[in-house]
């Protein structure tokens, strides 16, 4: 069974824990209790393949930013979460993405942009803004509501699909490099 290491990042209060707990335990946590770091595991079937999701729910608060490099190193894919009623959390996505790319030392890291709190009427981040940002990053965008469960499975499953595509691409590039290195050298 394939295991996928998923990391949920974003500013404090955007609903990272609520999304994760909704996926794992099928219930909505409405009281806010800032996370330092929580880890969850769940076996799921995605596109006919049984897999184990190892999900790291991270601290959004700035005082825990020193811990970020460590968990970003081990993550294979990242859910970059903002709240649709919090423009600052949307603007912060750029910083999380840059930090992930720096720590992973790669421009090509599996990510999904997630606009959470879709159930709230007080929207300040337009869907089109988020779609445009995701398009500029070359990553999928999904709107979710941890409260109603809308888009929750889709967000995590899409990230697994992005990781699979990334692994396939890396494996093809590895094979191309091996083929190139098999050229013969003739000495005269």
From Swiss-Prot:
It holds the Pfam family Ras. Signal peptide: none annotated. Residues 186-188 form a propeptide. Alternates between an inactive form bound to GDP and an active form bound to GTP. Activated by a guanine nucleotide-exchange factor (GEF) and inactivated by a GTPase-activating protein (GAP). Gene3D superfamilies: P-loop containing nucleotide triphosphate hydrolases. GTP binds at residues 10-18, 29-35, 59-60, 116-119. SMART domains: RAB, RAS, RHO. It is a lipid-anchor. The modification Cysteine methyl ester is found at residue 185. Keywords: Cell membrane, Cytoplasm, GTP-binding, Hydrolase, Lipoprotein, Membrane, Methylation, Nucleotide-binding, Prenylation. A lipid is attached at residue 185 (S-farnesyl cysteine). Its main location: membrane. It is found in: Cell membrane; Cytoplasm. InterPro entries: P-loop_NTPase, Small_GTP-bd, Small_GTPase, Small_GTPase_Ras-type. GO terms for cellular component: cytoplasm; cytoplasmic side of plasma membrane. One of its GO terms (molecular function) is GTP binding. It catalyses: GTP + H2O = GDP + phosphate + H(+). A motif (Effector region) lies at residues 32-40. Residues 167-188 are annotated as: Disordered. CDD domains: H_N_K_Ras_like. GO terms for biological process: signal transduction. Belongs to the small GTPase superfamily. Ras family. Ras proteins bind GDP/GTP and possess intrinsic GTPase activity. Plays an important role in the regulation of cell proliferation. May play a role in promoting oncogenic events by inducing transcriptional silencing of tumor suppressor genes (TSGs). This is GTPase KRas. The gene is kras.
């Amino acid at each position: 069974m394939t295991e996928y290491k998923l990391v949920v990042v974003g500013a404090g209060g955007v609903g990272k824990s609520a999304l994760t707990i909704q996926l794992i335990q099928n219930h909505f946590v409405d009281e806010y209790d800032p996370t330092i770091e929580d880890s969850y595991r769940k076996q799921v079937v995605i596109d006919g393949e049984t897999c184990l999701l190892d999900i790291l729910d991270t601290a959004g608060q700035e005082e825990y930013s020193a811990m970020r490099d460590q968990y970003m190193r081990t993550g294979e894919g990242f859910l970059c979460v903002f709240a649709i009623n919090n423009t600052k959390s949307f603007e912060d996505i750029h910083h999380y993405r840059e930090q992930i790319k720096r720590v992973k030392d790669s421009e090509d890291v599996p990510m999904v942009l997630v606009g959470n709190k879709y159930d709230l009427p007080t929207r300040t981040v337009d869907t089109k803004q988020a779609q445009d940002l995701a398009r500029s990053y070359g990553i999928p965008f999904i709107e979710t509501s941890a409260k109603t469960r809308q888009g929750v499975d889709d967000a995590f499953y899409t990230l697994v699909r992005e990781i699979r595509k990334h692994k396939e691409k890396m494996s093809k590039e590895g094979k191309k490099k091996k083929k190139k290195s098999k050229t013969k050298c003739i000495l005269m």
